């Protein structure tokens, strides 16, 4: 507190933004003692995320989250559903709540030549046939919703795909913190599963893969990996829960949404979606960081 108070006074800072509600107590104290504006940037309704994960203390967090947002001078939410929930349940002033979505650094899709070059690099790196369809899933595997999604891929989706002898494919799994009990997924090597682990450049995989699969059904909030995948003009098949916060009106035919737990339809779409479709320019108007930053600035003017 004292270090931050000194910095605020010396630098004549007027606004303080906190990410998530956890440091709400500190933000509120600094607002009171330094006469600054407090802005809370919510990535999702955190208490509800932990409720879906069946944490007993989610209700305590809910009340703390409510207090933090009510004490803020302005609140940024990453999607309209969260904003509407907070206005109704936390009793917030709508004029002090703005949807500022997660963003993407590119203002347009990569050139086809760049995507082809990335694909060739991935095929060479992982010994994949040029004619195979490359499916991608990535995420921190120490996070339960992602680990649950991996289990779905291994036990629900992949067996259905394997049964179709005419569909040639590989599933690449990227992400660290895979539990030791999974043994690096070596038991699945002969079942078209490639565990790449943590990769230095995930953008290479976004550019070079054919389809991003997102069978996540827990965890809440917008899935940043889906935003990034679409931004690289990568076709996406997602559960309904996994597509929260991404308007289907701006994704064209690049994202197919399936009801949670409907793995039959999910796998059918994997085999029928056309990766050659292009993400519409309206997608970048919505998710490009430059446009998002301008909206945030105007909200605080």
Q: Could you describe each region identified by the protein language model?
A:
Residues 190-199, 205, 257:
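Active-site donor-binding acidic/aromatic loop of nucleotide-activated sugar
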Residues 81, 100-103:
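Carbohydrate-associated surface elements
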Residues 275-301:
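A charged, aromatic-enriched C-terminal amphipathic alpha-helix characteristic of glycosyltransferases
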Residues 15, 31-50:
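Active-site proximal beta-strand in glycosyltransferases
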Residues 73, 207-221, 234:
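Acidic donor-binding loop of glycosyltransferase active sites
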């Amino acid at each position: 507190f004292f270090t931050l108070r000194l910095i605020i006074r010396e630098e004549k800072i007027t606004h303080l933004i906190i990410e998530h509600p956890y440091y709400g107590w500190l933000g509120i104290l600094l607002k009171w003692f330094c006469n600054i504006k407090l802005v809370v940037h919510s990535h999702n309704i955190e208490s509800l995320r932990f409720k879906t994960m069946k944490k007993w203390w989610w209700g305590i967090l809910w009340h703390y989250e409510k207090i933090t947002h009510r004490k803020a001078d302005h609140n940024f939410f990453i999607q309209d559903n969260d904003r509407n929930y907070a206005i109704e349940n936390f009793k917030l002033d709508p004029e002090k709540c703005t949807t500022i979505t997660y963003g993407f650094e590119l203002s347009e899709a990569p050139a086809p030549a760049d995507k082809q070059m990335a694909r060739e690099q991935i095929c060479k790196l992982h010994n994949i046939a040029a004619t195979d369809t490359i499916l991608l899933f990535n995420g921190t595997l120490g996070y339960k919703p992602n680990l649950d999604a991996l289990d779905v891929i291994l036990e629900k989706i992949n067996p259905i795909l394997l049964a179709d002898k005419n569909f040639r494919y590989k599933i690449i799994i990227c992400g660290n913190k895979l539990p030791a009990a999974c043994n690096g997924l070596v038991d699945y090597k002969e079942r078209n599963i490639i565990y790449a682990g943590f990769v230095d450049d995930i953008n290479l995989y976004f550019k070079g893969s054919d389809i991003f699969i997102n069978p996540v059904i827990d965890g809440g909030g917008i899935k940043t990996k889906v935003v990034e995948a679409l931004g690289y003009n990568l076709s996406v098949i997602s559960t309904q829960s996994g597509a929260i916060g991404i308007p289907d009106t701006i994704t064209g035919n690049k994202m197919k949404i399936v009801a949670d737990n409907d793995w039959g339809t999910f796998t059918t779409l994997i085999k029928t979606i056309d990766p050659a479709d292009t993400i519409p320019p309206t997608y970048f108007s919505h998710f490009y960081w430059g446009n998002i930053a301008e909206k945030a600035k105007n909200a605080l003017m």
